[in-house]
């Protein structure tokens, strides 16, 4: 029986990816650690990773824009809201239910993984290990356009578990069409359209370290192997050179363009204002992703959590909301859900878990957040995620 065209391409893509991986594997020494990671506090992981990772690579993963005020405030902002302790609610800890759904996909936890580039910096198996770890956690993996593994490689190890593809639109529509077609054929459940990075933020750590990616971006390499257009493919380039190839002049029409090409739901990522939320929903977004890129873009912008309630009010449940930026605690997950998010994404801690334990390390990070979330739900008198979403949070003004 003759193989389908898509099947033949997938096999070819996997073969090329293996060739490319072999070419650079000896040049950059990434972690090969495998196994569960003992975690008391996610904040402890950063120093452990720093001690063992290449300085430039660690700086790229950890760093934020300019003075990193926005990055720090993302986490600090959660302390401006309180969960009111509730008692005598008749709830057993064993009955706390973290399950939920997003875009019709059942999830064991409301915690998902934020798409992040170049995961091969953290671990030899990169995005493949992260995909396996998120699958084990019963959650969703999201692959970046700038990942070190191809869409086909991730699909091959997903084993039916859901994954999303994050698109950094190129100025070259041939690349967009090539990539979205592959995402659809490989089984991606949604496209994350990132719109908050028309240029890279001023990341001083990368500049001081003269950081250039030691590994190629597999999806860019795959396109370049078939279309010699002279584009940078990651290896030997800085982030500003990569972003320079990406589309800058976004318009709402791009949402329909991506939907038409992919035939998949489109999640618009990087929303920070109620006005933009309303605009992209009117343009056809199937979900919005409230995020300031983890403090890596506009340092003078507000904390992501601070803008979430006003955005949720405008969205008014027309589409689901994903939230990220600064999440380090189960209480942060609780507060984001209570402020209008439907699911909550985590970035850097996932990469730290990946570095320290591969797929099992990724799962360890999600399970730590789940443990803390269960305790916060129990003490806050909420039995399930819907109850969390109905919870009122308090601020200092309420006690004056």
How should these model regions be labeled?
Residues 1-10:
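Bacterial N-terminal signal peptides that target proteins for export
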Residues 10-19:
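Bacterial N-terminal signal peptides
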Residues 23-25:
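Boundary at the C-terminal end of the N-terminal hydrophobic targeting segment
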Residues 27-103, 203, 210-250, 386-388, ...:
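An N-cap/entry alpha-helix motif that binds or orients negatively charged groups
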Residues 74, 304-311, 354-374:
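C-terminal helical cap(s) of enzyme catalytic domains, especially alpha/beta-barrels
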Residues 106-149:
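Glycine-rich active-site/cofactor-binding loop and its immediate structural neighborhood
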Residues 118, 132, 157, 174-323, ...:
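Alpha/beta enzyme core
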Residues 136-157, 161-176:
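A gly/proline- and charged-residue-enriched helix-loop-helix capping module
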